[in-house]
């Protein structure tokens, strides 16, 4: 880590519940969430996540390609460094199977 590098928080640490029945959604469950993040080229992206019953985590680049994926994350897990090649919008996508419920805590940052 460089002397002048700084941690830029993209998503503050937050906790929430996933998997509840939601009649407003097409699948009838709140089982997929996406979080867009504005990123800068030349940096690295990190995501810290933990859940009670397992959650699938995907990081998607600004072209729509999956650059990192981890299935069934339960204990505290840091995904990264994921190199950022172009300035733009990347996305963090979280998912659980329909009917599964889990409590999720996550945050994301660039260095």
Where are the regions a protein language model picked out?
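Predominantly extracellular/luminal regions of secreted and cell-surface proteins
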Residues: 1-13
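A general secondary-structure signal for short beta-strands and their flanking turns/coil
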Residues: 32, 42, 52, 101-103
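Hydrophobic beta-strand segments within beta-rich accessory/binding domains
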Residues: 36-51, 57, 90-96
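Surface-exposed beta-strand/loop patches in noncatalytic accessory domains
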Residues: 10-27, 50-80
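Residue-level signal for short segments within beta-strands and strand-turn junctions
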Residues: 38, 59-63, 110
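Edge beta-strands of jelly-roll/beta-sandwich modules across compartments, strongly enriched
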Residues: 55-56, 98-111
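Noncatalytic accessory or regulatory domains flanking protease catalytic cores in secreted, cell-surface
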Residues: 64-103
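Non-catalytic, beta-strand-enriched accessory regions in extracellular/secretory proteins
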Residues: 20-40, 44
